[in-house]
């Protein structure tokens, strides 16, 4: 393992936004929602970044999208660095960031999550999107974290995760893998 590294942990991820009604209100009863940038993988990075460790999210963004701007600002606020190409949206039916609606539940009402991932830009992640030699070889990464969610998202993300794991091994980076099973997720 490399003795010095810039990033304690890095991960490939598909960023999106989650909206949640305030005060545990049911989704169908609310017209106000709290919006946050989120992904399963950056939730893992959040722990290390909160402890002052430098972290890196490897992702893609929709060029010119206010949602992409929001995501970048939220990642900066969480002390998470990011790298990712800015991809043209390609019209109203083109690429976008994932969008999910969360009901926190209350009393007998269980928490629920509805995902909308059609046209998700993160589904197109590729190893060619990143300067692997610079990230792993020059800057250094302590741990590459992979999630079953990003690995299973598309053929492209599967190939990207496998290539990143091989690169991590080549440069002496530890690899962690979280199956991240969610019975209610619909990809």
Which ranges hold each PLM region?
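Charged helix-capping and loop-helix junction motifs
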Residues: 158-163
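Conserved N-terminal subdomain of the carbohydrate kinase-like
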Residues: 54-148
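Active-site beta-loop-alpha junctions enriched in small/polar residues
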Residues: 149, 180-182
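Conserved small/polar residues in nucleotide/adenosyl-binding loops
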Residues: 185-187
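Glycine-rich phosphate/adenosyl-contacting loop at the front of the ribokinase-like
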Residues: 2-85, 127
């Amino acid at each position: 393992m490399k003795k010095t590294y810039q990033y304690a942990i890095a991960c490939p991820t598909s960023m999106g936004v989650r909206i949640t009604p305030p005060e545990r209100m049911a989704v169908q009863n609310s017209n106000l929602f709290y919006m946050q940038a989120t992904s399963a993988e950056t939730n893992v990075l959040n722990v290390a970044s909160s402890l002052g460790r430098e972290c890196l999210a490897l992702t893609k963004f929709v060029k010119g999208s206010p949602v992409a701007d929001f995501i970048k600002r939220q990642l900066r606020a969480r002390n998470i660095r990011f790298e990712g190409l800015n991809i043209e949206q390609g019209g109203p039916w083109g690429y976008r960031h994932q969008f999910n609606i969360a009901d926190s539940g209350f009393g007998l009402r269980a928490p629920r999550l509805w995902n909308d991932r059609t046209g998700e830009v993160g589904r197109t992640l590729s190893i060619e999107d990143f300067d692997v030699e610079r990230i792993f070889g020059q800057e250094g990464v302590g741990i590459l974290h992979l999630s079953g969610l990003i690995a299973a998202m598309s053929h492209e993300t599967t190939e990207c995760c496998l290539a990143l794991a091989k690169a991590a091994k080549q440069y002496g980076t530890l690899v962690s893998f979280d199956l991240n099973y969610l019975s209610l997720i619909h990809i």
